[in-house]
Amino acid sequence: MVKDVKPHILLRTASVLSLLHALLNTFAGLLSGTSGNQEEVAVLNAMKTVQFDAMGSLRTYWDFYFGFGLFLTLNLLLIFALLWQLASLAKTAPAIARPFIGSFCIAFAAFAILSGLYFFIAPLILEILIAVLLGLAYACARR
C-alpha cells in the first residue's frame, strides 16, 4: 500500500497542513481575544505595559510574544511554499528531494516535541500529522 503512494501527494498534503497551521497560529492564536478570565487579562496587561531594555530598544514581553508569533506564521508560510515546490521536485527527481524531505520530517518531529512540552494539543496534532506525512514521503521517495 505504501509503495503505491506518491511522495508528491504526501508533500502537497503536508504543505496544506503547514498553511493551516500558519492560519490557526495567526487567527486563533495571535489575533483572538481573551477568555475574559481576570488572571489572564492581568497577565496580558502586564505583558503589554511592563517595559525593559532589550539591546538598546525599549520592549515589552507582549512585543516578544506577538513578534515571535508573527515569525512563526511567516516561517510556516515559507514551509508551505517550500513543501509545495519540493513536491514538484519529488515527482521528477525523488532521490534529489529525499534529503530535504528528511530534514523537514526531523524538524516537524522536533516541533511536535516542543509543542507537547510548551504549548497545547492543536499545534501538536498538526505537527505530528505533518511529520508522519513527511516520513512517508521520505520512505516513498526511494524509487
Role assignments for model-derived ranges:
Residues 49-64:
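Juxtamembrane membrane-water interface segments that cap and precede transmembrane helices
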Residues 91-129:
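Hydrophobic alpha-helical transmembrane segments of integral membrane proteins
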Residues 11, 15-22, 69, 73, ...:
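Residues within membrane-spanning alpha-helices of integral membrane proteins
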Residues 9-37:
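N-terminal signal-anchor transmembrane alpha helix
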Residues 3-4, 78-97:
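Juxtamembrane helix-break-helix junctions at the cytosolic face
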Residues 129-141:
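Alpha-helical transmembrane segments and their membrane-interface exit regions
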